[in-house]
Amino acid sequence: MESLAQLPGIFLPLAGCVLALSLSALLAVGPIVRVTPTEVDICDLPAVREIHRVRGGYLKSEWYKSLTPPGVTSLLTLIEPTQYSEWRRLLAGPLSDTSLGKVEPMVTNHVHATIDRIASDLQSQGVSDLYKWWTYMATDVVSELSFGEPIGLLARPKETAWVMDYLDKVGIMHAWRTTFPFVFVLGRFMPVHPFKHAIQAIGLLGKWARRSIQQYRQHIQEQPESPKPTLFTKLFKADKFDDFQLTYLAGSYITAGSHTTAVTLLYLIYAICRDNEIRQKLLAEIRTLPENFRHDELRHLPYLNQVITETLRKYAVVSSALPRVVPAGGATLAGYYLPGGTTVSTQAYTLHRNEAIFPNPEKYKPNPKYSYLSMLSVWLIECRFDPSRWESPTQEMKDAYMPFGGASRMCIGNSLALMEIRLTTTLFLRRFPEVQMSRQNGMRDEDLAQEQYLIMAPRGHRLLVEA
């Protein structure tokens, strides 16, 4: 598009540090930068408000369709607003705050079981890997909510370890699927495939999901008046989706609702380990709770929620580009006219580091021992973590805060994620108030450097702690 030639451009490699490079460019040249001949990145709050405004006309780009196999649709990849609204009406009810209150005991039981596993590790090994256990917990929670029974990662970690083969690679795998789709097409004919174990795990997950769906259908037939509630009970009764579509839909819930929650919890505990003042203030607030508190009480703890909000600002798991398409007729965004059909991408990574909106968002200290790309990748480790900024947030801060996506397509599972994060943080710190990051087995801060693909993960895929 000829009119985009006037915009400054950058080259973005597939290296897990794309967002740091994009941030560097936006800081250097202004609020808009061209990343491909037909796509721009924007870090301009008025433009972000317009792009993500409900019924604003900026539809998701065709890129989203490349996230799923041919013939498969998920809530994430739906483009047409009417169809999306219909799906959301069917799916949103069980994920409302009211409905989640009914499953709180189940979620709490999984949290307690996870903390017991961590305690067992600490007693027998002296360290425990929170990345592993938070992922196991979140996966069991969302799988039980989806299918009526958990996959069983907490109860049978060795037998179900294949799930981690998939979740560990999901971010980079989707980056390759969307950028080099031929790798997946030709992969079945190649003796060596970069995602062999992850693809095998997808097959096992599908097999487990199909069996669980069949069992739940049988359960509904046996107890039609009072079946065990799941996220998809309404869909079973409405008979709007076949088993193939239900399998993929539930699988997408597991992908979206496990790794994201686990990584957020990991970085929250990591941030607490790095700042004793934050730890002590949070512990003092938690100690005011009764012994058998409920989640609703946690919703009203100001400092706990400030810590969670700041974690989601600094360590937003889905902080990569959210591509939308400029409507026919074009639009002027960030001072530039963009023709209709141009892809415009916003991303939480740069918005959450906009100093005009979030004062002092960084405290980066270059280290000469790191290479250029490594410095970009570890940049976020030194980003300033300040929960107090959320005591009286400005409207600009609220509008720029996008850990769950833009207003028009907000993540449907954000209430569930926040419930898990609040319950887990509180119960874990009650059990282990003096938790510290371990230095055993070569554990270091650089293991927590963020790898940014479709979703973010710590580079070392671990957080070893002692308590």
Swiss-Prot record:
The keyword Ion transport does not apply. Keywords: Heme, Iron, Metal-binding, Monooxygenase, Oxidoreductase, Signal. Pathway: Secondary metabolite biosynthesis. Coiled coil: none annotated. Induction: Expression is under the control of the azaphilone cluster-specific transcription factor azaR. Its EC number is 1.-.-.-. Pfam families: p450. Residues 1-28 form the signal peptide. The keyword Protein biosynthesis does not apply. Heme binds at residue 411. It comes from the Eukaryota. Its cofactor is heme. InterPro entries: Cyt_P450 (IPR001128), Cyt_P450_E_grp-IV (IPR002403), Cyt_P450_sf (IPR036396), Cytochrome_P450_monoxygenase (IPR050121). GO terms for molecular function: heme binding; iron ion binding; monooxygenase activity; oxidoreductase activity, acting on paired donors, with incorporation or reduction of molecular oxygen. Belongs to the cytochrome P450 family. Cytochrome P450 monooxygenase; part of the gene cluster that mediates the biosynthesis of azaphilones, a class of fungal metabolites characterized by a highly oxygenated pyrano-quinone bicyclic core and exhibiting a broad range of bioactivities. In the first step, the non-reducing polyketide synthase azaA forms the hexaketide precursor from successive condensations of five malonyl-CoA units, presumably with a simple acetyl-CoA starter unit. This is Cytochrome P450 monooxygenase azaI.
